UniProtKB/Swiss-Prot annotation:
In the N-terminal section; belongs to the aldehyde dehydrogenase family. Disruption phenotype: Reduction of 29.3%, in total NAD(H) pool, and 11.1% increase in the NAD+/NADH ratio. Significant, but modest, reduction in the ATP pool, and extends lag phase during growth. Increases susceptibility to gentamicin, but not erythromycin, chloramphenicol, rifampicin, penicillin and vancomycin. Reduces production of the bacterial capsule. Simultaneous disruption of alcohol dehydrogense adh resulted in similar growth rate, ATP level, and survival rate after erythromycin exposure. CDD domains: AAD_C, ALDH_F20_ACDH. GO terms for molecular function: acetaldehyde dehydrogenase (acetylating) activity; aldehyde dehydrogenase (NAD+) activity; ethanol dehydrogenase (NAD+) activity; metal ion binding. The active site is at 257 (nucleophile). It comes from Streptococcus pneumoniae serotype 4 (strain ATCC BAA-334 / TIGR4). InterPro entries: AAD_C, ADH_Fe/GldA, ADH_Fe_C, ADH_Fe_CS, Alcohol_dehydrogenase_Fe, Ald_DH/histidinol_DH, Ald_DH_C, Ald_DH_N. GO terms for biological process: alcohol metabolic process; carbon utilization. Fomepizole, an FDA-approved inhibitor of alcohol dehydrogenase, causes redox imbalance and enhances susceptibility to antibiotics, in vitro. It also works alongside erythromycin to enhance killing of bacteria in vivo. This suggests the potential of fomepizole, and related molecules, as adjuvants to antibiotics. Its EC number is 1.1.1.1, 1.2.1.3. This is Aldehyde-alcohol dehydrogenase.
Length: 883
């Protein structure tokens, strides 16, 4: 008789790979067929398949019990019921086909697609229920599944899969929607997991199998081992806790991975709990029996030299307590449900504190709450990271403390952990037989695995404009002598006036105090008159300290931009002392989504802004510019919480402003209005304000500077506030970005700096760019057209956008010259060499400035450096090139 041919490992591997490839190719065909199913068809298939499995739940449980020789028939039947009933009920109304969600407000549409062919790995512990579960969630998501069953449960697992498959096909599913490897082997399982046609791996099994799944270079939904503690704290319902733990631990002879592996009992209730535990046929082993149990279960004894090398004896998994005791070498009463072993600590020295997957449980005494939590934490971290932990207590706060302490995804409160872990019976966890352990357990999923995990959710995002706004002071008073409002303002008793020395010397401070003294109630006031031009953060801090000591209910900021800006930040520091200045100055793309959220102001004080120059518009804006002179930095701070409560725009306060000051501040107004009009955040609400402000400037600034008549001064005062209203909501651009940095370095006058830069910025922004700005509402470049609008309004040549840009830039330059401004930086007393040495740094700093993001074209550092260098000589001598 000829010798039987020996199959080599390589031949065995090739056979396995061929078989697997045939299965996967069939599954790929099924995938295309399943893509054609609609939601109604899918739900019908799942319903029919689940009913078929439900009808055979007892038959399948018996098959699994007989084939594996493990667990409890009745409990396996319950697990099959759970997979058919709870899982399907939970996903009954889940949309898994096509458009599953549509939101007209956000513009998002979600579309569900199958992930592809699923590789399903199942364990010997829950063979039929896991096969049912994975088949049903795959069908629900239109994914064909190919199983690699555990060899010791091959037939019962295939039996379960066959019932689901046949029912699904009868209901309209494609022929190969559910398949399995018929000749199980490690080679076949490896080939399936690594097959390029497999999209994802759904693995339930031992750590080695899960690790292998994650090593395949494709998405894997693998779950880790558990080592679940149950901490019974002294306030717990002892009868309930003992009942739950016994029921949970004995369920299917402890084979559910979420079952308790140790019970930790507070010393105050230890004896009472143990007595209750014993009443449910739990047998506590003695010292000798414990040693025998350790040796049989793990091959080592407690505190022996080789404890670290303990390995679970796979023969005990799912076996009855009586059988385990007998095999270990001792006898227990008939009907014993659980073997309990008292242990002194958690860890390698006590092998019975490891995961056992059998009706064997470690029992530990806790000396305190802290000790109980520590022991529970140690259990989870002893080869059970991320899985589950249970606590029995009446203390809700302790439950939260416990949840924070243990590295477990599932914290199960006052419930049996077997059913608490798999969900939907004792709590609202997702019903599942595959329990993710998150990053703690080196898993990609940190929840109970469900149908959602087998979907690719595509998002269709419709373009939408960001919601914009119009935020201004709640009240703005104007016209001559409108400071009389101070007599009538409500709830004014303690007033801090923030101003500068000029306001004191010119008598403006006295006029404010006079109005306060005319009130019916007596007003106590504190004066801080030390604000300097370009106020420094140290000045702000000094004013804040005085404010904290005085405790005002009203702040009045009197003066130009400097007192108003300083007062705003004092207001912020006074009401919110914990705020860090460094947080305030951070740049943002969208003021509503900034990394640092400004706190709301106005709880302690109201803020009244009274401008005495016509330039900054700070009385109506959410901005403040604060210097850090020690580091030559100037920071524009922006947040709507800084918007004054009330603005009083009284033209009588600007009649004595010197002409050169009116010139500088007037050009600042023009820059505000121009930059707001072309800003990418400009809107219909701000455009009208900006255009009116520009019109008022060109009609009145020259007369305001040269004649100082009431009419022109009033119009310029109004223009300043109107421009402020516009740029408070549309923001500014790079003229201000560069002006802030130049002013900080060379201490130039802010309005004059803007006047010199503005013609350059108009030409720069008016040139169609290569790199455009980013803002949804700004859907195409149009700054050149908006400059053309301005030129037309002013009656300038503007037959084309290019002509309008050039006309307007020239008009701005000529206006500056007419009012006496030397329109270059050379004539501001700045050394040419020093200017050029700093130009690069100033350009970088300007790019970082908060005004840059709203510029209508993306500002490039090289371009701003060129503008800065050209502006030294002035627009007339070196107008710069259009970039």
């Amino acid at each position: 008789m000829a010798d039987k041919k020996t199959v080599t490992p390589e031949e065995k591997k090739l056979v396995a790979e061929k078989h697997v490839d045939e299965l996967v190719q069939k599954a790929l065909v099924a995938l295309e067929e399943m893509r054609k199913l609609d939601q109604e068809q899918v739900d019908y298939i799942v319903a029919k398949a689940s009913v078929a499995a439900l009808d055979a739940h007892g038959e399948l449980a018996l098959h699994a019990f007989e084939e594996t020789g493990r667990g409890v028939f009745e409990d396996k039947a319950t697990k099959n019921l759970f997979a058919c009933e709870h899982v399907v009920n939970n996903m009954r109304h889940t949309k898994t086909v096509g458009v599953i969600e549509e939101d007209d407000v956000t513009g998002l549409t979600l579309i569900a697609e199958p992930v592809g062919v699923v590789c399903g790995i199942t364990p010997t512990t829950n063979p039929t229920s896991t096969a049912i579960f994975k088949s049903l969630i795959s069908l629900k998501t239109r994914n064909p599944i190919v199983f690699a069953f555990h060899p010791s449960a091959q037939e019962s697992s295939a039996h379960a899969a066959r019932i689901v498959r046949d029912a699904a096909i009868a209901a309209g599913a494609p022929e190969n929607c559910v398949q399995w490897i018929t000749q199980p082997s490690m080679e076949a399982t490896s080939a399936l997991m690594n097959h390029e046609g497999v999209a994802t791996i759904l693995a339930t099994g031992g750590n080695a199998m899960v690790k292998a799944a994650y090593s395949c270079g494709k998405p894997a939904l693998g779950v880790g081992a558990g080592n679940v503690p149950a901490y019974v704290e002294k306030s717990a319902n002892i009868r309930q806790a003992a009942h739950d733990i016994v029921m949970s631990k004995s369920f299917d002879n402890g084979m559910v991975c979420a079952s308790e592996q140790a019970v930790i009992i507070d010393k105050e209730i230890y004896d009472e709990f143990v007595a209750e535990f014993k009443s449910y046929h739990t047998y506590f082993v003695n010292k000798k029996e414990k040693a025998l149990l350790e040796e049989f279960c793990f091959g080592v004894k407690a505190n022996s030299k080789n404890c670290a090398g303990a390995k679970l004896n796979a023969d005990i998994v799912g076996k009855p307590a009586t059988w385990i005791a007998e095999q270990a070498g001792f006898t227990v009463p008939e009907g014993t449900n659980i073997l309990a072993a008292e242990c002194k600590e958690v860890g390698e020295n006590e092998p019975l504190t490891r995961e056992k997957l059998s009706p064997v449980i470690a029992v530990l005494k806790s000396e305190s709450r802290e000790d109980g939590i520590t022991k529970a934490r140690q259990m989870v971290e002893f080869n059970g990271l991320g899985h589950s932990a249970a606590i029995h207590t009446a203390d809700e706060e302790l439950t939260k403390e416990f949840g924070k302490a243990v590295k477990a995804i599932r914290v199960i409160c006052n419930s049996p952990s077997t059913f608490g872990g798999i969900g939907d019976v004792y709590n609202a966890f997702l019903p599942s037989l595959t329990l993710g352990c998150g990053s703690y357990g080196r898993n990609s999923v940190g929840d109970n695995v469900s149908a959602i995990n087998l979907l690719n959710i595509k998002k269709v995002g419709r373009r939408r404009n960001n919601m914009q706004w119009m935020k201004l002071p709640s009240k703005t008073y104007f016209e001559r002598d409108s400071i009389q409002y101070l007599q009538k303002c409500r709830d004014v008793e303690r007033v801090m006036i923030v101003t500068d020395h000029a306001m004191v010397e010119l008598g403006f401070l006295d006029r404010i105090i006079e109005q306060l003294d005319l009130r019916r109630n007596k007003v106590v006031y504190q004066i801080f008159a030390d604000v300097e031009p370009d106020p420094d953060i140290t000045t702000v801090n000094r004013g804040t300290e005085i404010m904290r000591a005085f405790k005002p209910d009203t702040i009045i900021a009197l003066g130009g931009g400097s007192p108003m800006d300083a007062a705003k930040v004092m207001w912020l520091f006074y009401e919110q002392p914990e705020v860090d200045f460094r947080d305030l100055v951070q740049k943002f793309m969208d003021i509503r989504k900034r990394a640092f959220k400004f706190p709301l102001l106005g709880k302690k004080t109201k803020f009244i802004a009274i401008p005495t120059t016509s330039g900054t518009g700070s009385e109506v804006t959410p901005f403040a510019v604060i210097s850090d002179k020690a580091n030559n930095r100037k920071y524009p701070i922006a947040d709507y919480s800084l918007t004054p409560t009330v603005a009083i725009v009284d033209p009588a306060l600007v009649l004595t402003v010197p002409g050169f000051v009116a010139a500088d501040t007037g050009m600042d107004v023009l820059t505000h209005a121009t930059e707001a009009y072309v800003s990418q955040m400009a809107s219909d609400y701000t455009d009208g304000l900006a255009l009116q402000a520009i019109k008022l400037v060109f009609e009145n600034l020259e007369s305001s500077v040269k004649n100082a008549d009431f009419h022109s001064r009033e119009k310029m005062h109004n223009a300043s506030t109107i421009a402020g209203m516009a740029f408070a909501n549309a923001f500014l651009g790079i003229s201000h970005s560069m002006a802030h940095k130049i002013g900080a370095q060379f201490h130039t006058i802010h309005g004059r700096t803007n006047a010199i830069l503005l013609p350059y910025v108009i030409r720069y922004n008016g040139t169609r760019p290569a790199k455009t700005a980013t803002w949804p509402k700004y859907n195409y470049y149009r700054a050149d057209e908006k400059y053309q609008d301005i030129a037309r309004m002013l009656g300038l040549p503007a037959s084309t956008p290019e002509e309008g840009v050039e006309s307007y830039a020239k008009a701005v330059y000529e206006l500056g010259e007419r009012i006496g401004i030397q329109m270059n930086f050379r004539d501001q007393g700045i050394d040419e060499k020093e200017w050029k040495e700093h130009s690069r740094k100033l350009a970088f700093l300007a790019y970082e400035d908060q005004c840059s993001p709203a510029n209508p074209r993306l500002p490039m550092v090289d371009h701003m450096q060129e503008i800065i260098e050209d502006a030294y000589y002035g627009y007339k001598e070196r107008p710069g090139r259009r970039k």
